[in-house]
Amino acid sequence: MASAVFEGTSLVNMFVRGCWVNGIRRLIVSRRGDEEEFFEIRTEWSDRSVLYLHRSFADLGRLCKRLRDAFPEDRSELARTPLRQGLLAIKGAHDIETRLNEVEKLLETVISMPCKYSRSEVVLTFFERSPLDQVLKNDNVHKIQPSFQSPVKISEIMRSNGFCLANTETIVIDHSIPNGKDQLLDADSTEHLFENGGEFTSELEDGDDPEAYVTNLSYYHLVPFETDILD
């Protein structure tokens, strides 16, 4: 499963003042056609700077899990927060607008928590810009494709004045991909709430070959591309 989040933070002595979810981007991240959904998040920081981030549903689940792990003595207090309910609401949303609203509510809950949590390294790391954010900021589809040798599609659903607007898709076709039913994979990334394969993690369907999956789209693969763009 793709992830935009990485360890460590340079945002010391800073905190998030506000965040808004602008829309969704979908990337095909494996040669079997697995599609990952990323929420585009606009964040305003305490120094008035603005960052545009891209986080998946799995990233949101990991954020909640890492908060619990970072403060084991406060598990009971964290359990009373609406974080888990927020994840379930996002997972159960059946339309784009509702899903975007639920993601925004969850993030507002996180940054509104006591400073002990909202300004912790876990939260600051989540909101720090990753190489994936840099790549998607430039809409450089061709920079992503070489890692997978697979079709890459970016489609955006952006919100404007309360409505969803579906923008034109950009599609890059790799003819080396064989045709056939193997390309039709119903991969629901929202089945994975926590990275440790917890209670919401679905098992691979019978007959699926785990080795057939391509390495996830992550910051490790995108670091070289960030350098290319900046050059």
UniProtKB/Swiss-Prot annotation:
Organism encoding this protein: Mus musculus (Mouse)
Gene Ontology molecular functions: phosphatidylinositol binding
Name of this chain's protein: PX domain-containing protein 1
Gene name, Swiss-Prot/TrEMBL: Pxdc1
UniProt domain PX: residue ranges: 1-134
